[in-house]
Amino acid sequence: MPLQSSRLAVDNGTPVRGKPWPVWPQPTDGTLDALSRVLRSGRWAISGPYRGVESAERRFARRFADYHRIAHCVPASSGTASLMLALEACGVGAGDEVILPGVTWVASASTVVGVNAVPVFADIDPDTLCLDPDAVEAAITPATKAIVVVHLYAAVADLTRLKEVADRHGIVLIEDCAQAHGAEFEGHKVGTFGAVGTFSMQQSKVLTSGEGGAAITADPVLARRMEHLRADGRCYRDQAPPSGHMELVETGELMGSNRCISEFQAAVLTEQLGELDRFNALRRHNAELLDALLTDVGYRPQRSTPGTTARTYYTYVAELPDAELPGADITKVTEALTAELGFPVAPAYSPLNANPLYDPASRSRFALGPQHEKLIDPARFVLPVSGRLTRRLVTFHHAALLGDESDMRDIAEAFTKVLQHRAVLAA
């Protein structure tokens, strides 16, 4: 790979890349027809009148469950909503402690305080950036009700050990798979190892309808509870109603709220699901090429837990070389890479004990008394691995992995060029 000697693009030099990159989302050939069918159907929501045919929402739920070889799928309005459904369906509530990783998207924690429970942040594994089982074990108390394991960026967490810890202590294990659609561990899809697996279908995700989510489970009781929780306390009838009547029935079993997706979203998701494996395979192939190129010049790509049989690349992540960039300002590095490549390169998520997006004290709804406020104060947690690593990680969105080998070489060339100019990137 030729080394660049020109000035950095951020310093008025010539960028490595001038061509456009692949965009995301990418609609399938059948998406417009699927949306048109919903538009003409007379039913745009699950609360709309039954028209004698399977709804788009039920069709997607059935196919997503089949994809995971699991019995039940409950679609929802977002990944956040799906995680809240899972927590409440599993009985997590006021005063319960929920262990989750110190580095993840803020919703993994905000959903916990949203059900009046207490997030407990545990540190991460330095290789996978996922929840460290030893840190989880150390964080368990008599108040621990659940563990939320997040499969972060492009890694699968250590499900063998985390499931063993959860089972041994009688704690519910919930998988947050918002960034891991289609990933596999020991030949099984993620989301099928815990009591519930939750997914996000937001714009940036590898399976998307702009906004949306889903929860999967093998447990019919949990599935029925989640149906009630997402549809204002209603669930599907056992038998189809007469045409023109609503499929949902009021049972009085469990109060819920409206967290449903529309028929339009479900139609898009069904189309996208048919392309998920193809896109995932392309990203995986290109990520493996890039791993080799970046490793050659000293970067350290994110790893996945041994036993991972299929990775899903939501975000590509690499750690800066210690020798060449020991004291680099991560913001300067990501700005330099962005200027070279023409797409956003960003630092990793800030640890949740110091993340400006996670501030329960800014919401009066969480002011439930001095003791509760003390428990949900994120500053009480010490996360040394999270703090150290997030100052050394660069990340970019999976859309760039939808190109070809020459695109991966452009990315590697930009990363190499930045190394050449390390003196100007020091903190």
Swiss-Prot record:
InterPro entries: DegT/StrS_aminotransferase, PyrdxlP-dep_Trfase, PyrdxlP-dep_Trfase_major, PyrdxlP-dep_Trfase_small. It comes from the Bacteria. This is L-glutamine:2-deoxy-scyllo-inosose aminotransferase. Belongs to the DegT/DnrJ/EryC1 family. L-glutamine:2-deoxy-scyllo-inosose/scyllo-inosose aminotransferase subfamily. PANTHER family: DTDP-4-AMINO-4,6-DIDEOXYGALACTOSE TRANSAMINASE, TRANSAMINASE. Catalyzes the PLP-dependent transamination of 2-deoxy-scyllo-inosose (2-DOI) to form 2-deoxy-scyllo-inosamine (2-DOIA) using L-glutamine as the amino donor. Also catalyzes the transamination of 3-amino-2,3-dideoxy-scyllo-inosose (keto-2-DOIA) into 2-deoxystreptamine (2-DOS). The keyword Transferase applies. Its cofactor is pyridoxal 5'-phosphate. Residues 1-20 are annotated as: Disordered. Its EC number is 2.6.1.100, 2.6.1.101. One of its GO terms (molecular function) is pyridoxal phosphate binding. It catalyses: 2-deoxy-L-scyllo-inosose + L-glutamine = 2-deoxy-scyllo-inosamine + 2-oxoglutaramate; 3-amino-2,3-dideoxy-scyllo-inosose + L-glutamine = 2-deoxystreptamine + 2-oxoglutaramate. Keywords: Aminotransferase, Antibiotic biosynthesis, Pyridoxal phosphate, Transferase.
